[in-house]
């Protein structure tokens, strides 16, 4: 393996089901089966959720110790899945935990030995899996830090197939950070593998390679699928380009050079009404056949295209809400990129500040790097905080401050958050 340069941090979270949560009344409960939710857009559609938090804070249903990693929890079929690493120098063991959603009871744990470099045992380096697992039917797909990919049985944790991408291809050490996605019969993984296999499509039933594409270096950004220009498009933001691929065969529709440092290409692309927002770059992708037209910024300097190197913004109608450097939350005009307002009231963190924004029920949940969950109204008129509660203690040390970076999962009127020490479930159910 090639040794990857030290990365500042890693970023690395469909369908609905009828379920019963802590009671006998059946409710429509949305699973959160992959990175950033059912549609991979960060939106939580459940109702019956708290509008304000109790004075004493959120009710913690359960918590369980885990190891290091930046992958998000996922929740599906009454279960919660979290990947981590158990570090016992000089050895490392990557694991997948399955918990019962209601109680936190451990249902199964799958573990395998993985080779970690000497540098990975320094706490500030942030070792462990970053790619968030994805649930698809009765299968759970997990990608490890070095690309070791497993397909596990959701109920038992039994291995259905495995593929060690880090051994079969040329992959930079500890670099497989983007979260996988499922597209029809394919499991698509972005690992930066070479030669020509930066993006790989695998048969999700067998793990067999179906196609490979690009020679781009991997980034921290997870790919998405959009419908635009009359086509399904796979959008991939690497450390050297922004590309649109045909998810069926890997053919490139369009590609724009977009060189960044290893710290910058973090945000997941966001798509809404033919607009594609990639951190601080806005494109129109309505053309048929597929093509991209720049809307803003006018200056094609990499630094001008980065809104935040820690967080993914939210595109809501004609406005964008997202983190900006040094702990700011900003509102931008979607058509022009013009900043309308900013506030520093969410987090005391500056360098490395992070905000995960989740629209829900006409308001928003914001999860900060300090482990706080905030309920707020966001509009072009400004930021109005409704409630704030501490959810989980930050544990990852950087520059004499501790952070928690993994975005939480929201399911069954509950929130699930993880640090490098534990996973926590708290109730957001109204009327409890």
Indicate where each model-derived feature is located.
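Noncatalytic, solvent-exposed loop/strand surfaces
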Residues: 27-432
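Bacterial N-terminal signal peptides
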Residues: 10-25
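N-terminal secretory signal peptides that target proteins for export/translocation
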Residues: 1-10
